[in-house]
Curated annotation (Swiss-Prot):
The modification N-acetylmethionine is found at residue 1. InterPro entries: NDK-like_dom (IPR034907), NDK-like_dom_sf (IPR036850). Coiled coil: none annotated. It comes from Merluccius bilinearis. Its EC number is 2.7.4.6. One of its GO terms (molecular function) is nucleoside diphosphate kinase activity. It is found in: Cytoplasm; Nucleus; Cell projection, Lamellipodium; Cell projection, Ruffle. This is Nucleoside diphosphate kinase B. Major role in the synthesis of nucleoside triphosphates other than ATP. Belongs to the NDK family. It comes from the Eukaryota. GO terms for cellular component: cytoplasm; lamellipodium; nucleus; ruffle. Its cofactor is Mg(2+).
Length: 128
């Protein structure tokens, strides 16, 4: 079972999309891998401009499919970005791109004791 880090970005929060997608931010650390990109300063400013709704999702290879492509124009209907995004600069949601990055990003935002472990009964009926 894979985990990935998910953050609804400020435009998604401001547009009231947290419920549709199901004031704590560390943009400088979170996007450190992009620090040499020309858009880095603007991205950090944007990610600090309002609250972010952070969470961890778990599933078998479905997270990227549910999010859609980074560019909403390339996202399929039925994905979060395909249904709710306006443009690439305001694509409402961040999702880890690899399992390795997910572990790092989850560690930036959450402490291990903040997770609640529970056995979902339906899981045995859905996953082999």
């Amino acid at each position: 079972m894979e985990q990935t880090f998910i953050a609804i970005k400020p435009d998604g929060v401001q547009r009231g999309l947290c419920g549709e997608v199901m004031k704590f931010i560390q943009p400088m650390k979170h996007y450190l891998d992009l620090k040499d990109m020309p858009f880095y300063a603007g991205l950090c400013k944007y990610m600090s401009s309002g609250p972010v709704f952070a969470m961890v999702w778990e599933g078998e290879g479905i997270v990227k499919m549910m999010l859609g492509e980074t560019n909403p124009a390339d996202s399929k209907p039925g994905s979060i970005r395909g249904d709710f995004c306006i443009n690439i600069g305001r694509n409402i949601i961040h999702g880890s791109d690899t399992v390795e990055n997910a572990k790092m990003e989850v560690g930036l935002w959450f402490k291990p004791e903040e997770f609640v472990a529970y056995a979902e009964k339906a899981k045995a009926w859905v996953y082999e």
